[in-house]
């Protein structure tokens, strides 16, 4: 098996410019493809997840011109020209869910599938929502999961669409992005969320980006959304993808654990991503954090004892960045509790189980619940732990931080970071020092 040995490191400092946000990149690509006009996207993330979206859009007849991190997309004015396609979407939830919705109203015959793990990630709530407006979608293997067959359908809206919000916010995102393409009698479509909506900041990203493309969604709290029907997205001309706030979390934690000063460029106060909230969680743990509009500085830990304070927090709003807190908790002077993280179980892997298993390898005492994780750090980290990564980019990036505890650590299958951050380990090595 491929592996990478890191550390031991005693400090981390320097400046890192973040790659583009995965969540924003794939949303903007789809919106630009559906819009009227030509859109120039800058700072587009180059990763496995964006490549599968680009490949799919190309297969569907969208004209794309890429040059480095810039992509010029010629919009299709709301309808893909290819009426049959077989689309392989890897393990990219940000591609599978929104594309499924867009294809369901496109009047074609499509197959949507991915890697084996994608076929274990739920999509039933989205399909149920789309069937309410007449979409013809069949499951090829297991009810509620990809692969999917999508067929031409008579789409009509005559009542509010109901969708569950407690498994993944991507189901609601997919509906919101697609419904402007659908006609309705009174010119608007209502979406009602059943249960508590998780990961609300990701819905905020969706609504803000739709607005950049000329479509305004009204919302009543987080339970009711009103979407204009039968309208056209319009290209904003140019749009820049801000840095990936989830990816920022590893470097911000490194700046705390490794003393800093460490500056992350590309996200800050002006970010539309909820995961910048990670900086506040890190501050609660005692890190010295300063934030500008598009940068964040971290300069070590503000306690004389040099350890982070333990944290007990609800991480429903920032589930991806919360993984970094679980590893940072190894460096706290007490027990930390991460609550309301049930969504971890349906991500790239079952992240609660994976995180519990790997934290134990470095000596932590772990209590794992259906939607929580309790981390008690060891007196001393176990050196030379071989960390399994479960084909999950975030597991690999999180556990790189163990090397800042003065012990070497082995990361198995390090190339899995290609999903969102192909050169992560090069960037990390440039900042970490023995």
UniProtKB/Swiss-Prot annotation:
CDD domains, alphabetized: EPSP_synthase
Pathway annotation: Metabolic intermediate biosynthesis; chorismate biosynthesis; chorismate from D-erythrose 4-phosphate and phosphoenolpyruvate: step 6/7
Keywords of the record: Amino-acid biosynthesis, Aromatic amino acid biosynthesis, Cytoplasm, Transferase
Active site (record annotation): 320
GO terms for cellular component: cytoplasm
Residues annotated to bind 3-phosphoshikimate: 22-23, 27, 168-170, 199, 320, 347
Subcellular location: Cytoplasm
Keyword Transferase: yes
Domain of life: Bacteria
Catalytic activity: 3-phosphoshikimate + phosphoenolpyruvate = 5-O-(1-carboxyvinyl)-3-phosphoshikimate + phosphate
Chief location category: cytoplasm
Description of how the protein assembles with itself and partners: Monomer.
Annotated function: Catalyzes the transfer of the enolpyruvyl moiety of phosphoenolpyruvate (PEP) to the 5-hydroxyl of shikimate-3-phosphate (S3P) to produce enolpyruvyl shikimate-3-phosphate and inorganic phosphate.
Protein name as it appears in the record: 3-phosphoshikimate 1-carboxyvinyltransferase
């Amino acid at each position: 098996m491929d592996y990478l040995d890191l550390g031991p490191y005693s400090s981390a400092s320097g400046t890192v410019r973040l790659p583009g946000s995965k969540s924003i990149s794939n949303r903007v690509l789809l919106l630009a493809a559906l819009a009227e006009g030509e859109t120039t996207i800058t700072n587009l993330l180059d990763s496995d997840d964006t490549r599968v979206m680009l490949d799919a859009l190309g297969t569907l007849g969208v004209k794309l011109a890429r040059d480095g991190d810039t992509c010029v997309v010629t919009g299709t004015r709301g309808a893909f020209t290819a009426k049959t396609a077989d689309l392989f979407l890897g393990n990219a939830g940000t591609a599978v869910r929104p594309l499924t919705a867009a294809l369901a109203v496109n009047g074609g015959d499509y197959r949507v599938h991915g890697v084996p793990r994608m076929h274990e990630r739920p999509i039933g709530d989205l399909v149920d929502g789309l069937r309410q407006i007449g979409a013809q979608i069949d499951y090829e293997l297991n009810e509620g999961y990809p692969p999917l067959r999508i067929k031409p359908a008579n789409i009509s809206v005559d009542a509010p669409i109901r969708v569950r919000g407690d498994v993944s916010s991507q189901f609601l995102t997919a509906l919101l992005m697609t419904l402007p393409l659908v006609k309705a009698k009174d010119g608007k479509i209502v979406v009602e969320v059943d249960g508590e909506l998780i990961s609300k900041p990701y819905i905020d990203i969706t609504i803000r980006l739709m607005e950049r493309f000329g479509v305004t969604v009204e919302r009543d709290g987080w339970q009711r959304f009103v979407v204009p029907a039968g309208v056209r997205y319009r290209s904003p001309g140019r749009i820049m993808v801000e840095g990936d706030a989830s990816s920022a979390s590893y470097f911000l934690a490194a700046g705390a654990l490794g003393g800093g000063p460490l500056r992350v460029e590309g996200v800050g106060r002006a970010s539309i991503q909820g995961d910048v909230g990670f900086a506040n969680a890190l501050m609660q743990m005692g890190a010295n954090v300063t934030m500008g509009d598009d940068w964040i500085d971290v300069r070590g830990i503000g306690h004389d004892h040099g350890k982070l304070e333990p944290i007990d927090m609800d991480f429903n709003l920032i589930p991806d960045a919360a993984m970094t807190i679980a590893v940072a908790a190894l460096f706290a002077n007490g027990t930390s509790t991460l609550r309301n993280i049930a969504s971890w179980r349906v991500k790239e892997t079952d992240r609660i189980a994976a995180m519990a298993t790997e934290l134990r390898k470095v000596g932590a005492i772990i209590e794992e619940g259906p939607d929580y994780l309790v981390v008690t750090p060891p007196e001393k980290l176990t050196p030379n732990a071989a960390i399994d990564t479960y084909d999950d980019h975030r597991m690999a990036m999180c556990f790189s931080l163990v090397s800042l505890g003065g012990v070497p650590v082995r990361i198995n299958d390090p190339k899995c970071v290609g999903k969102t951050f192909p050169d992560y380990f090069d960037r990390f090595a440039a900042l970490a020092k023995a």
